[in-house]
């Protein structure tokens, strides 16, 4: 199974990806996480350091694939999760999609691409071009990381459009949204009402999730010395269980930009009416159930 994780830049994709990878490993799966970001820091919380990228390794070998060994590019992380960083082209030059393609090509050359139960692609920022949508070519499922904010959901809608486009030619489905570090989900629910898709989990607004990134540790590793964090790990284990159940997923139909802008901005500009509408719907549902 191959999973591509997308979301607005800075939303917490790498932190979430690392914890999902650990959760999958805790369920007995052999997991490879591939960071697809020029910053090459996707796997930092798994390994505790910035591992060399595949592009750097290939450059040092003059792109002689036969001179590259698995241990040159695959690093063992916490919990037995294997880690790879694709890296990226120089700033302002090249294509990130090419880098992803070279990474997959090398892993196939090393007979490593098909050795894992789950491969998770952690992809940078928003999908702004076909190049960075490249991991969707290999994925069975896409997961979108968001929060309860305007910008993150606007980005999620653009990613949903990319999933729909790729699903025309690939067996790709959207597994769902993951709300990261948010105390509310009303705007998420409003968006999902307009663009139907599953919400896999909404992670609590706790500082430890952000701090784990700075410490270079996953929540699972931190929980070994801070048992109070075990309840947070259950959220990631729940996501892993849903993924491993091989959900049907959806091919989303994104909301047109202007319509989405109006929908989300109205929620901010007229909060009282939006909340009263939602309360009215809840009351109606209760009445029907009685």
UniProtKB/Swiss-Prot annotation:
List of residues binding ATP: 10-15, 39, 180-181
Cofactors: [4Fe-4S] cluster
Molecular-function annotations in GO: 4 iron, 4 sulfur cluster binding; ATP binding; metal ion binding; oxidoreductase activity, acting on iron-sulfur proteins as donors; oxidoreductase activity, acting on the CH-CH group of donors, iron-sulfur protein as acceptor
Top-rank lineage group of the source organism: Eukaryota
Catalyzed chemical reaction(s): chlorophyllide a + oxidized 2[4Fe-4S]-[ferredoxin] + 2 ADP + 2 phosphate = protochlorophyllide a + reduced 2[4Fe-4S]-[ferredoxin] + 2 ATP + 2 H2O
Chain sites annotated for binding [4Fe-4S] cluster: 95, 129
Positions bound to Mg(2+): 14
Entries under Gene3D superfamilies matching the protein: P-loop containing nucleotide triphosphate hydrolases
Annotated signal peptide: none
Biological process per Gene Ontology, one example term: light-independent chlorophyll biosynthetic process
Entry EC number(s): 1.3.7.7
GO cellular component assignments: chloroplast
Primary subcellular site in the record, as a coarse category: plastid
Cofactor remark from the record: Binds 1 [4Fe-4S] cluster per dimer.
Top class in the EC scheme: oxidoreductase
Location of this chain's protein in the cell: Plastid, Chloroplast
PROSITE patterns: NIFH_FRXC_1, NIFH_FRXC_2, NIFH_FRXC_3
UniProt keyword list: 4Fe-4S, ATP-binding, Chlorophyll biosynthesis, Chloroplast, Iron, Iron-sulfur, Magnesium, Metal-binding, Nucleotide-binding, Oxidoreductase, Photosynthesis, Plastid
Pathway: Porphyrin-containing compound metabolism; chlorophyll biosynthesis (light-independent)
Coiled-coil residue spans: none
UniProt cross-references to Pfam families, sorted A to Z: Fer4_NifH
Job of this protein: Component of the dark-operative protochlorophyllide reductase (DPOR) that uses Mg-ATP and reduced ferredoxin to reduce ring D of protochlorophyllide (Pchlide) to form chlorophyllide a (Chlide). This reaction is light-independent. The L component serves as a unique electron donor to the NB-component of the complex, and binds Mg-ATP.
HAMAP family xrefs: ChlL_BchL
Oligomeric form and interacting partners: Homodimer. Protochlorophyllide reductase is composed of three subunits; ChlL, ChlN and ChlB.
Family the UniProt entry places it in: Belongs to the NifH/BchL/ChlL family.
Name by which UniProt lists this protein: Light-independent protochlorophyllide reductase iron-sulfur ATP-binding protein
Species whose genome carries this gene: Zygnema circumcarinatum (Green alga)
């Amino acid at each position: 199974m191959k999973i591509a994780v997308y979301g607005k830049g800075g939303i917490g994709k790498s932190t979430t990806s690392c914890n999902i990878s650990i959760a999958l490993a805790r369920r007995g799966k052999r997991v490879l996480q591939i960071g697809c970001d020029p910053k090459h820091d996707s796997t930092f919380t798994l390994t505790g350091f910035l591992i060399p990228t595949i592009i750097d390794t290939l450059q040092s070998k003059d792109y002689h694939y036969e001179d590259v060994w698995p241990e040159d590019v695959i690093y063992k992380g916490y919990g037995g999760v294997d880690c790879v960083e694709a890296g990226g082209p120089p700033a302002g030059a090249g294509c990130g999609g090419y880098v992803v393609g070279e990474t997959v090509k090398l892993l196939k050359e090393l007979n490593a691409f098909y050795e894992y139960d789950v491969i998770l692609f952690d992809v940078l920022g928003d999908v702004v071009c076909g190049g960075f949508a490249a991991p969707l070519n290999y994925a069975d499922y896409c997961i979108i990381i968001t929060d309860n904010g305007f910008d993150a959901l606007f980005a999620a809608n653009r990613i949903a459009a990319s999933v729909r486009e790729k699903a025309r030619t690939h067996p790709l489905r959207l597994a769902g949204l993951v709300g990261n570090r948010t105390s509310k989900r009303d705007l998420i629910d409003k968006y999902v009402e307009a663009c139907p898709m599953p919400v896999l989990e909404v992670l609590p607004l706790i500082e430890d999730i952000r701090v784990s990134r700075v410490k270079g540790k996953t929540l699972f590793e931190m929980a070994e010395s801070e048992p109070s964090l075990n309840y947070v790990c259950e959220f990631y284990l729940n996501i892993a269980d849903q993924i491993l159940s091989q959900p049907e997923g959806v091919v989303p139909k994104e909301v047109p930009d202007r319509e989405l802008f109006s929908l989300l901005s109205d929620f901010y500009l007229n909060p009282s009416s939006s909340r009263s509408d939602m309360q009215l719907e809840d009351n109606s549902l209760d009445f029907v159930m009685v």
